[in-house]
A protein has these predicted regions:
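Helix N-cap motif at beta-to-alpha junctions
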Residues: 3-6, 120-125
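Extreme N-terminal "head/tail" segments of very large remodeling/mechanoenzyme assemblies
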Residues: 31-36, 55
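Short secondary-structure capping/junction motifs at helix and strand boundaries
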Residues: 8, 20-33
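Hydrophobic face of alpha-helices
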Residues: 9-12, 54, 69, 128
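A common structural junction motif
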Residues: 17-26, 133-143
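Non-catalytic beta-strand/loop surface segments
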Residues: 1-7, 28, 41-47, 51, ...
Length: 186
């Protein structure tokens, strides 16, 4: 956001370009840096996984609150996209190939599968015309089924017990979580 029209136009350009024309589609090394890659730090060392998203998700998967939140969504919404971790499970991230990533990106990161919101005191027609000319008209309309399914109600309550890791130095005192959840409507 910006109150300055020139800055706002520049921000629109930067964000639209980043989403619709990312360099990751041209350079596999970006996928390896951001997603995951093998790493060997010493010639006779252990081969490990590394990558920005891989490491971020390892951190997210180590937090008890995140573990609880993920399991709540998986149990409450098993038939929907909400059952899955949007950032990826670190154990599964390493199975993602560059080609699979590109296929997913090309299918879902398309203007036909987006909502663009503009808000504020501006010339909306001028902004929409600029977006169309600079970005949107370069794409053919696609029919993309990205409907989010509604989870059917369960006939019986579900009880689930899950466990999470703690380090040897962490206390187990007050380290138990209890969560009672319900879905209110669609």
């Amino acid at each position: 956001a910006s109150r300055n029209d020139k800055d706002f136009r520049n921000l629109m350009d930067v964000y639209l370009d980043a989403v619709l024309n990312p360099n990751i589609g041209k350079e596999k090394k970006i996928f390896m840096q951001e997603g995951w890659h093998y790493e060997l730090t010493e010639p006779d060392g252990e081969l490990t996984y590394n990558g920005v998203v891989y490491n971020e998700m390892k951190g997210a998967f180590s937090s008890p609150e995140s573990v609880l939140d993920r399991h709540i969504k998986a149990v409450m919404f098993p038939d929907t996209c909400y059952a899955f971790e949007s950032g990826g499970d670190p154990e599964e991230i390493t199975a993602l190939t560059y080609e699979d990533y590109l296929a997913f990106y090309n299918k879902y990161y398309h203007p036909s599968n987006s909502y663009i919101y503009l808000y504020g005191d501006m010339d909306f027609a001028e902004k929409l015309e600029w977006m169309d000319k600079e970005y949107l008209e370069k794409y053919d309309r696609q029919e993309i089924d990205s409907e989010i399914q509604i989870q059917k109600a369960f006939e019986e309550p579900i009880e689930k017990e899950i466990f999470y890791s703690v380090s040897e130095t962490e206390s187990l005192e007050n380290a138990t979580y209890l969560s009672v959840n319900t879905s209110a409507g669609n």
